[in-house]
Amino acid sequence: MERLHHSLGILQEHILQNRYTRRELDEFLTATLTRFSDWMARLVALRKVRDHKLSYLDFPHGEFRRGQRDIAELVYKCIDQGGQLMVEAPTGIGKTMAVLYPALKALAEGKHEAMVFVTARTVGRRAAESSLALVALQGPETRALSLTAKDKICFSPGKACHGDDCPFARGYYNRLPGALDAALQLPTLSRANIEAVAREQEVCPYQLADDLLPWVDVVIADLHYLYSLYPRLG
């Protein structure tokens, strides 16, 4: 087997040759597919538990505020029937929970696969995180991931994002399974939690958050992530 590496900076090509027996390739493929199958089975199991618990989720505040139920019903109908919805409501009415609650109920019913909550302000991110924390008190095992800009979460500022320059990129994919396993033990993947797991597992926190996207139910992100998130969520 030949692999061609092209170094753009110095305009050089490097050809690496490796020889494997058929048995070695068969064993590698079998082991790889087994690991992948185990991860997919785990994902299915997590979602079954999540959907079961969300089906019994009550509105976290007990009673809806004036106008809050109307928003929640509109959000649910929009998800169920498709389309777009724009809502304008006074400050303090509880818009964040009025959006998240019906979206979570629809998630349990299989009407969509994931939620993306984008906001232009830090206060919006905190409102979403606190609302989901209230939901978690009832027991639903929904996993929320708060994305942080690369320049703010990077452990090696000023270094290139590859193994030759950054120790957290070196051997990243060898340590990724352990990092994913540790992260998935946490119900909320805030910036602090992502950084803690990344330091413990010695992996890049920004890349870890990116690789966690298929595993989470709610993504909370800055408005600038809007156009890049959907392809990554698949």
State where each predicted segment sits:
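Walker A/P-loop
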Residues: 80-102
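Short, surface-exposed connector motifs at secondary-structure boundaries
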Residues: 81-86, 106-116
